[in-house]
């Protein structure tokens, strides 16, 4: 089954809603954003969650030491590096975060524009992180745009990335289009924020459940094809 993360969790009700819907992980944004959550709030939410649920903190251009302190203080099981953290720093992040999941976000448009030299920096460091997440950031906004990137254009690139890393697809996913994303990319995971909200950081119960159901159905369909 495709791993499913509901990102931008800001309150316990939404966390329980996503957990009950069948999400595998929740995301907590600590970088400046309309969906930002304070560490104290996130820690209280995480303390109330089942242990099997992933708790992923989203950070931007924080040092390995700062990220490690955040993970320890809040109780995170993983970190999503959403900024410009270079490939040659991945070893330092891994050393600072033993036993925790590390996801490195790359912006799809940047990947397409920069080409293989840009990707090779992360390919050479792939042993130090657990997944590449492809997102559709915009100028001044590193995620949560609600706009998908060009799936057809980047599909061949995703196939190459999958040769050396687990891949998570994000960026403009909704209950209506996530099945198509699963069919096109056959990713290890998918990640959604604005596509299941009725306002920034406020989850819509029916949309969350519909999203998780759509992922499950699409994953089962892909399994039958294999």
Give the predicted meaning of each segment:
Residues 40-49, 91-93, 193-226:
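C-terminal helical cap(s) of enzyme catalytic domains, especially alpha/beta-barrels
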Residues 17-20, 44, 69-73, 92, ...:
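Well-formed, non-transmembrane alpha-helical positions, independent of function
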Residues 1-5:
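Extreme N-terminal starter segment of soluble prokaryotic enzymes
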Residues 75-76, 187-190:
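Proline-aspartate-enriched helix->loop->beta-strand connector
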Residues 160, 168-183, 197:
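A C-terminal functional module that forms or caps the active site or interfaces directly
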Residues 25, 30-34, 41, 48-168:
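Conserved anion-binding
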Residues 18, 79, 132, 150, ...:
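Conserved, mostly hydrophobic/aromatic
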């Amino acid at each position: 089954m495709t791993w499913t993360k509901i990102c931008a969790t800001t309150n316990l009700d939404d966390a329980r809603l996503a957990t009950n819907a069948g999400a595998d992980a929740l995301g907590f944004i600590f970088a400046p954003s309309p969906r930002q959550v304070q560490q104290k709030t996130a820690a209280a939410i995480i303390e109330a969650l089942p242990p099997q649920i992933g708790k992923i903190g989203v950070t931007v251009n924080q040092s390995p030491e700062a990220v490690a302190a955040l993970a320890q203080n809040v109780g995170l099981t993983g970190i999503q590096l959403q900024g410009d953290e270079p490939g040659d720093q991945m070893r330092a992040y891994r050393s600072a975060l033993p036993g925790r999941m590390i996801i490195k976000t790359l912006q799809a448009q940047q990947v397409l524009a920069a080409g293989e030299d840009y990707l090779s920096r992360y390919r050479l460091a792939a042993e130090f992180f657990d997944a590449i997440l492809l997102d559709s950031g915009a100028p001044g906004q590193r995620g949560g745009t609600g706009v998908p990137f060009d799936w057809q254009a980047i599909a061949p690139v995703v196939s190459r990335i999958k040769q050396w890393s687990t891949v998570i697809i994000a960026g403009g996913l909704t209950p209506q289009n996530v099945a198509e994303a699963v069919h096109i990319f056959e990713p290890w995971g998918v990640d959604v924020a604005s596509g299941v909200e009725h306002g920034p950081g406020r989850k819509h119960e029916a949309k969350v459940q519909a999203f998780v159901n759509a992922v499950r159905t699409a994953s089962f369909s892909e399994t039958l094809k294999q």
